[in-house]
Amino acid sequence: IQDVLFWMDAIRQSDDRYRTLESFWKGQINSKVWLIEQLKKLPRAHSMDILICGGWYGVMATLLFNSDLYVNRITSIDIDSKCENTANTMNKQYEIAGRFRAVTQDMMTYKDYGGYDMIINTVCEHLTTEQYNEWLNLIPKDKIIVLQSNDYVIPEHVNPMKDLNQFVSQSKLYPIVEPSELQ
């Protein structure tokens, strides 16, 4: 329940409450919960340090902390400077414990990908193919990379995928443990 109280504080304190509330829309929450269910299928023997690229307002981080995955710490980066304070407020108890940090940062210029066990990018549709390829080259080969995209055609989605096959082929990641999609 503590997280819900921090979520409400974050919404109340947000400069753009409507935009912050968008992170709680049914589709947003369902896709994040679905992703966590997929992650539970992966064998993990130790507590992981996770980097979330395009972490927005930090909802994914809170859901990860509340899952039964072994999460040590999470850093959430987002290019939008308005997200940092809201994400830190949403995850206040984890921030206080030193387990969460939100940072205003462009994933294309981020320098510390090597400091994490798992890199999660749930905003692939916001990257052109060229940007995605550049971003992928920044990540050390020994990392677990988790990707999520969608097929929503809206102006800010510069690269929506028409289906899972297109996404898998454009991901350029092998081996792929188990590509799957939320219906």
List each model region and its residues:
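S-adenosyl-L-methionine
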Residues: 1-45, 79-118
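Conserved class I S-adenosyl-L-methionine
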Residues: 45-58
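Structural motif
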Residues: 53-55, 121-125, 148-151
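Conserved SAM-binding loop of SAM-dependent methyltransferases across substrates and taxa
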Residues: 57-70
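Conserved SAM-binding motif I beta-strand of class I
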Residues: 72-79
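A short SAM/SAH-binding and catalytic strip from SAM-dependent methyltransferases
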Residues: 116-131
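C-terminal substrate-binding/active-site "lid" region of AdoMet-derived donor-dependent transferases
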Residues: 128-183
